[in-house]
């Protein structure tokens, strides 16, 4: 009997940096001075919403994670933008309708604001790049692609100019192993590549709900590529999730601690980022994102 997949993403690599990376960087970073947080991060901390006790079905109910302090983040090797690598790429695979293409473009715009890095959409690739041995018919007659093949045979060798992260988006359903029903996506954080399927996000005739899910999943996965572990204390886009229901329940906002981590290597203007997020959410009628961003802006005035 096939296993029912509840995980939004099956991780090709652990979300945590491996021991070898930690040991290699520990000697260099152990003496690094940890500066106190800037006033910005203290000001917006008031808007962090503490997570309640996990219940059956929640990610933290079945995954006893330890979290990641700011000090642990700083003293662990992670990816930061350089002049040679500072562009995020999205690679569509398949035949998308006009609404889906619009969503992919809106994801591009959002990621560019969220990470304050140039983000580009590569030329659409045909489903024909997936061979028969990496395809199957799913339990309700839908065609599925083997997610691991897309990572290792499509994305790993794809090196567009100045690539810092690459995420494929496919309109076909995905599966990670023969015995699993499906998976929403798969990622290799070591190689800074991931693939996500919009197939199961599109069931409801609700453009904004599907867009909101894409924004959360893409920013979450790319956040992992930049060294952010799962957030276990407050409602945050970096929370782990076991289902689409849990994804919908979690915030699109990056909490004050995760923002501070990201900003250490990216050195962007936090206020500029917030104002751009506010405009994006307003222009696209995304109420939850607009609400939490307005709260942060009010807190820093």
What are these regions (language model features)?
Residues 15-158, 165, 274-301:
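N-terminal low-structure segments adjacent to metalloprotease catalytic domains
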Residues 23-54, 184, 191-204, 212-213, ...:
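Metalloprotease/metallohydrolase-associated module, dominated by Zn2+-dependent proteases
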Residues 84-87, 163, 190, 252:
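A structure-centric signal for secondary-structure junctions around beta-strands
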Residues 102, 106, 209, 213, ...:
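Short, well-structured alpha-helical interface segments that form or flank functional binding sites
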Residues 159-225:
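Active-site-proximal segment of zinc-dependent metalloprotease catalytic domains
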């Amino acid at each position: 009997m096939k296993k029912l997949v509840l995980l939004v993403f099956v991780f090709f690599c652990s979300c945590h940096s491996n021991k070898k990376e930690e040991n290699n960087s520990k000697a260099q970073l152990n003496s690094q001075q940890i500066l106190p947080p800037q006033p910005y991060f203290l000001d917006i901390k008031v808007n962090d919403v503490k997570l309640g006790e996990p219940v059956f079905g929640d990610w933290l109910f079945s995954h006893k994670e330890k979290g990641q302090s700011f000090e642990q983040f700083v003293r662990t090797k992670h990816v930061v933008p350089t002049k040679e690598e500072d562009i995020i790429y999205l690679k569509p695979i398949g035949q998308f309708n006009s609404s889906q293409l619009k969503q992919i473009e809106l994801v591009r715009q959002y990621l560019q604001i969220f990470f304050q890095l140039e983000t580009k959409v590569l030329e659409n690739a045909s489903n024909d790049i997936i061979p028969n041995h990496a395809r199957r018919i799913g339990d309700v007659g839908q065609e599925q692609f083997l997610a691991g093949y897309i990572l290792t045979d499509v994305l790993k060798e794809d090196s567009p100019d100045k690539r810092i992260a690459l995420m494929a988006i496919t309109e076909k359903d995905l599966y990670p192993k023969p015995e699993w029903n499906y998976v929403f996506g798969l990622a290799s954080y070591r190689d800074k590549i991931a693939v996500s399927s919009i197939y199961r996000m599109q069931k409801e005739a609700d453009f904004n709900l599907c867009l909101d899910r894409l924004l959360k999943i893409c920013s979450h996965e790319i956040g992992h590529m930049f060294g952010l572990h799962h957030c276990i204390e407050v409602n945050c886009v970096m929370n782990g999730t076991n289902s689409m229901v849990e994804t919908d329940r979690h915030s699109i906002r990056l909490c004050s601690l995760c923002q501070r981590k990201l900003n250490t290597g990216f050195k962007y203007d936090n206020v500029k980022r917030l104002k751009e997020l506010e405009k994006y959410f307003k222009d696209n009628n995304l109420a939850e994102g607009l609400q939490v961003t307005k709260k942060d802006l009010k807190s820093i005035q």
